[in-house]
Amino acid sequence: MAQLPPEDIATMPAQKVVFNAPFDNKATYYVRIINPGTKRIGFAFKTTKPKRINMNPPNGVLGPKESVNVAISCDAFDPSSEDSKGDRVTVEWCNTPDPAAAAFKLEWFQGDGMVRRKNLPIEYNV
């Protein structure tokens, strides 16, 4: 039997993550991930700046119609001396092999199963 691709997810905000100046203190922005589909999914966040950008929780499991708020934090930095162009966070998700899975497993993303992703560019308002 062929594996079905993961259904869409929704993020709030839908397009980008925004951090406002000043950047001399840690700042946190919240993103809600919503699973409007009918299957349980596993999700994981990645970023192009792992030393500056942190996510909590960085991964998890969402049942059908469930949602979770993820805190995306930006550590203090100097935008005049550090390149921030192209910074983004990416959420990847896949169907869980076990419909009753409650705990995230990295192996879901390492096999030959279908993984979808959504990029959220980071905008720094200086």
Curated annotation (Swiss-Prot):
Central component in molecular interactions underlying sperm crawling. Forms an extensive filament system that extends from sperm villipoda, along the leading edge of the pseudopod. Residues 8-125 form the MSP domain. Its main location: other. This is Major sperm protein 3. It is found in: Cell projection, Pseudopodium; Cytoplasm, Cytoskeleton. Sperm. The modification N-acetylalanine is found at residue 2. InterPro entries: Ig-like_fold, MSP_dom, Nematode_MSP, PapD-like_sf. GO terms for cellular component: cytoplasm; cytoskeleton; pseudopodium. Keywords: Acetylation, Cell projection, Cytoplasm, Cytoskeleton. The keyword Flavoprotein does not apply. The gene is MSP-3. It comes from the Eukaryota. It comes from Globodera rostochiensis (Golden nematode worm). Pfam families: Motile_Sperm.
